[in-house]
Amino acid sequence: MDSAFMDDIAAFPLPFCREPMSSISHMLGAFVFAVMAVLLIRRGRGDWVRTSSLVVMAASSVLLLILSSAYHLAWPGPTRDFLLRADVAGIFLLIAGSMTPVHAILFTGRSRWLTLVGIWSIAIVGILFRMIFHQWVSDAVGISIFLICGWGSLATAIVLWRRFGWTFIKPAVFAGASYTLGAIVLLFHGPTIIHGIMGPHELWHIAVLSGLTMHWRFVFQFASGLQISRPRLKVIHYQPATREAA
C-alpha cells in the first residue's frame, strides 16, 4: 500500500520539504481547522456528551492533517516510513472521529452507543493492522477498506435523510462524494494536472480538505444540539348535529 501514498508522488522537492504542495496544503488545513475547532467546541457547550464528541472529531481532523503534512515534509528514511504508517492509520481515526458527533448528538440509546462502539472497534483494528502489518496490504485493498468504512455510514445517512430531509444531510453527502473521488484518483494514479506540482496525490489532498470542510459544515448544524420539530396533529372535535325543535 505504501506505493500509492509515497513511491508514486512525483513532486519537485525543496531543500526543506520533500513534497511541498502536499505538505503545505495540509499544514494550512491543520491551522484553519484548529481555529475552527475552537468555535465548534464552544458551540457544543452545555452537554458533556455533545462537547466530548466534538472534541474527538476536531482532534482527529487536525491530527490527521498534521501527520500528513509532517510525512510529506520528511525525506526518505526511517522517520518518513513511520510517518507514512501513522498518516494512513490516521484515516481510520478520521472516519471514526467524524462519525462520533453524528451518533452522539443525533441518536440516543443503543443507536448511539452500540454504533459508536462498532465504529471505534473497526478503527482501532485498522490502526493496529496498518501500523504493524502494513507491508501485507496492497494499494487496492487498502483504499477499498477506507471506502467501505466511509460508506458504511450510508445507513446513518438514510435515517437522517428520512428524519430531517435532504437539505440537512446534503453537506455530509457531498463530503462523502469528495472523499470517494479523491480515493479513486489516488487508486488509479491520475490525472496529473501539472507534473511535479499538481498530481494525483495533491488532488487527493484537495479532496480531503474539501470533504472535511463539508462534513464540518454538516456538524455545525447540530453542534449546539438539535430539537427535532415534529408536525402537530390537528385535533378535530366531532359534534353531532342537533335537530331543531319542531
Task: Explain the meaning of each model-derived region.
Residues 1-246:
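Multi-pass alpha-helical transmembrane bundles in non-GPCR membrane proteins
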